[in-house]
Amino acid sequence: EYAGLAGGDSNGNGSLMRILPVCIYLKYLQEECGLKDVTCLEIVHKMSALTHAHLRSKMSCGIYFYCVRELAKRNKPLEELLQNAVDLSFAFYEKNNDSKKELEHFSRIRNMEKLRKILAEQINSGGYVIESIEAALWCLLNTSDFKDCVLKAVNLGHDTDTTAAIAGGLAGIYYGYKSIPEHWLEIIIRR
């Protein structure tokens, strides 16, 4: 069922970094086929478990799924869409005792306004999945376009490529492909 380790010290950010394509596909299936949230999250959790099977890692990917789905609507301000995504994900995870216990680790992302106001020096961007989702959301909340979001993520230091990938995925969903600087696209091989 999974290859990833499930211990508490196995909460790296690798599965979160790779989950974006799955989230986009599941969002499409929800729109086209009426796939239910519970089914989407089962799939997201199984995908995470390929490399990171601890519930905290799987929940991070689940929260990311909700962020992708809500940001793709682009019908409200970014902070409002993110808050809605977090509210929906917390409501889902509060239904299960195990995941409900894990929600304490996500306390800093519970309120987008409070998260946005945290000082940069208090944002960690290492390899721990909780740090990564916090940093990605913080970067998105504290910028107003794709480029600045990705640069802010990189400038946090530490695990810069992963934090930028996680934040950049969400920024790309919200701001769109045309928001990516052309000179960044030009250097992509075989694009």
Label for each model-derived stretch:
Residues 1-143, 149-155:
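Amphipathic alpha-helical interface segments
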Residues 146-150, 162, 181-183:
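Extended hydrophobic-aromatic, low-complexity segments
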Residues 34, 167, 182-186:
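Short amphipathic alpha-helical leader/targeting segments
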